[in-house]
């Protein structure tokens, strides 16, 4: 409980600082609106907030024809539930409409952002303790947590109605389950896990990556144990059916009430389906499109340079001290598997932005810790980390933008 309080204070303090960041200039075009709190502070209401709020106020909007949030209904429903609790609680002892439904929903989304970020930091701590076998000072965990709680994404999306904070939770949840939860579990237990992930797909698309990670992990286990049999093939087939079942049921329900399922990501941005579209023309078209998309992806990794640098430093120091560049153990291999799966997914996605690619940041951070050995116990290294984190947060707060 004490650590939850510490993480809560950390998240709120760091993100309160962003309220005092430079406000957008009149000539700056961005997807959203600046909401001033007073002469010194304010926040950005992202343009996507309009649909998030509309559907939370009236979830029936989710079953409208071609509705933007239709493919991910659960996040909206969660916000709606929290929002109406806030609304009715705030008006419990008065006949006046103190806060209003829309503001209640907005507060609900910010609460969700906080809850998601809090869970991400809790998982991050658990992962770090596993990777270091508990031999790491608590203050170092708090310092490393700053990278997750304070960055350009939390600056742009923490104070708005959005689901972008899930980009921090997804990779950490995947790593934690990979290295700690899934090992030795029965097939029935895994079926339940895959079904829950399938339900998660109705909240955020990256649950597809988690499913891919665990299927590959299970396939490798079959290979190691020389158990590639009909039973293992049946398990994989049933797992796929169970995972996609919630989405199929949602699509079936929409068709039952006369609504054609709509995925904004597919229709507007051609995410993933660009591959079949290109292949339907020719193999050359596919290769050309893949080349262009890979280039576009690597244009968005600039926000990861610091974390690539941290990993490189741990590899360099380890090489000097032990003669080995990388710590090849079960945990580091599983983190690398996550990095490859998440990285490949975002390479072939077909839509590219810094905020999507930054999903790799927590994985790179965990990989750096896994490879650091005793480095993080060194006092000089801890001071260097403190200075790095302080500069990182200061730059994020004082820099101009991003606003969407």
Where are each of the predicted segments found?
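Transmembrane-helix signature of polytopic, membrane-embedded enzymes
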Residues: 90-104, 119-150
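Hydrophobic, aromatic-rich transmembrane alpha-helices
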Residues: 121-122, 219-225, 295-329, 339-343, ...
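Perimembrane helix-loop-helix junctions
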Residues: 178-184, 195, 209-243, 324-326
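Multi-pass, polyprenyl lipid-linked donor-dependent membrane glycosyltransferases
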Residues: 112-116, 143-173, 178, 203, ...
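Membrane-lumen/periplasm interface segments of specific transmembrane helices
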Residues: 216, 223, 232-319
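Specific aromatic-rich, kink-prone transmembrane helix
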Residues: 123, 166-183, 189, 193-196, ...
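Membrane-interface alpha helices of multi-pass inner-membrane proteins
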Residues: 189-205, 211-213, 241, 343
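Transmembrane alpha-helix segments characteristic
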Residues: 142-148, 192, 234-241, 324-348, ...
